[in-house]
A protein has these predicted regions:
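Short, conserved secondary-structure segments in the cores of folded domains
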Residues: 35, 47-48, 76, 86, ...
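Helix-rich terminal scaffold detector
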Residues: 1-8, 170-298, 302-308
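Short, glycine/charged-enriched hinge/interface segments at domain edges or termini
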Residues: 2, 56-222, 227, 361-362, ...
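Flexible glycine/proline-rich
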Residues: 2, 23-28, 37, 83, ...
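Intrinsically disordered, low-complexity, positively charged segments
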Residues: 1-65, 70
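Generic secondary-structure signature for well-ordered alpha-helical cores
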Residues: 9-20, 36, 40, 141, ...
């Protein structure tokens, strides 16, 4: 039985990276994809001294003695709006009406807000002094030309897309989405639209796994149920491995008479690297390769399949796309109540993270075991209990893996 770290190392060592797996897409189609190129600023940002608000562009030296009772009186010599430039120079005793986002005219070193200004018949009365640079965003303060803006390996979020657009990236190189098939094994499974008969349950793992895989960037080709039949299991694996980069199965990976995934893989000639992992839940996790196709055999219980996916399959899918960060973030929080461990296996228990009195606390969810999909829906973290601990008492600091 492998330690989690050893199992993950084996999986990633046999998972291809994004080399020779890139494609160019439009920026509009890039959201959620993994960027495979460093992007540098092609200009200063802003590319000019920019007004932060509506008002008047002025020389601060002209307003040093301005008060409501003795306002400075300046001559209005023009107007400049966003998207236009003022073709002139502001001299002593002059001002230009300016709008938010417009370039500050030459000669001006401040923008005075409209609220302290009276303007009439070409005369601008300003009731307060200004400081040099007031209400101006200087050229290049956000980014200098040539600066690295977005690194290769980053996820293109809406915020990153805005940066890419700012610096002219109409097309971007991204990692190819791995194609993936989900197979849920078990004669007890029925489709979601069917009413289960005695001893049957609806197939929920297909939908959670397909959703997790899509969230990790995979292109899910198909999903379905495979009965507990050796020939059917072998045929389903062979057929899907021929069309997909990844085949992900749930169930059929333990030691029972109807756990047929490993025997089917062996007869197909797959190379099995991981068979059991010292973790709870998720111990009977399998990883293999059939040709160049990755095969993940995950446990059948919904919570077990979710934990195993996030610890093993998600990092592999992200590595295939060239992601720099492939693991879920970890933080520490104080246990709000006692947390049980499962030595000699590492435990991952669903919990809820909250902030109380300025500190992070995590509450273990009350759940009925690894089949309790209803409780797991409420979880936003996994509470990690090491292999050598029986648990934690309330108030102790624990490690948690963020799921959201």
């Amino acid at each position: 039985m492998l330690r989690i770290e050893d199992a993950l190392d084996l999986i990633l060592a046999h998972t291809p990276d994004a080399r020779n797996r890139s494609e160019a897409v439009t920026l509009a189609d890039s959201l959620g994809r993994i960027l495979l190129q460093d992007v540098f600023s092609d200009l200063d940002m802003p590319p000019f001294d920019r007004a932060r608000m509506d008002g008047y562009a002025v020389r601060s030296a002209d307003l040093t003695t301005a008060t409501p009772d003795n306002p400075a009186r300046l001559k209005e010599i023009g107007e400049v709006a966003a998207g236009k430039a003022f073709n002139g120079f502001i001299g002593v005793g002059e001002a230009v009406r300016i709008m938010t986002g417009a370039p500050v005219p030459a000669g001006a070193d401040a923008v005075q807000k409209i609220e302290v200004i009276n303007a009439k018949d070409g005369v601008v009365e300003i009731q307060e002094p200004t400081k040099p640079g007031q209400n101006i965003t200087p050229r290049g303060v956000e980014a200098k030309a040539g600066k690295l803006m977005v690194e290769a390996g980053a996820v293109i979020t809406p915020a990153a897309a805005a940066v890419l657009a700012t610096f002219g990236c109409a097309m971007v190189d991204v990692g190819v989405r791995p194609s993936l098939v989900v197979l849920s094994t078990g004669t007890e499974l029925v489709e979601v639209w069917e009413k289960p008969r005695p001893a049957q349950i609806r197939n929920s793992n297909t939908f959670s796994l397909a959703g997790y895989a899509q969230a990790a960037g995979a292109e899910v080709l198909s999903a379905g149920i495979v009965r507990d039949d050796f020939d059917e299991t072998k045929r389903a694996i062979a057929e899907t491995a021929a069309i997909a980069d990844v085949v992900m199965l749930s169930g059929g990976v333990s030691m029972g008479d109807y756990d047929l995934v490993k025997p089917a893989l062996q007869e197909l000639g797959a190379e099995i690297f991981v068979e059991k992992v010292a973790m709870h839940p998720g111990k009977p996790t399998v990883f293999a390769k059939l040709g160049e196709t990755l095969i993940f055999g995950l446990p059948g219980n919904p919570v077990s399949v979710a934990v195993a996916f996030h610890l093993f399959a998600r990092p592999a899918l992200l590595q295939m796309q060239g992601a720099k960060e492939i693991h879920l973030p970890r933080v520490q929080a104080y246990a709000a109540s006692n947390v049980k461990g499962a030595p000699p296996r590492r435990s991952h228990q669903p919990g809820r993270l909250t902030i109380r009195a300025g500190r992070a606390e995590v509450e273990p969810l009350k759940w009925a075991g690894s089949s309790d999909v209803v409780a797991f829906m409420q979880a936003d973290v996994l509470i990690v209990v090491p292999e050598d601990r029986k648990g934690y008492e309330a108030g102790e600091l624990v490690d948690v893996i963020l799921l959201r």
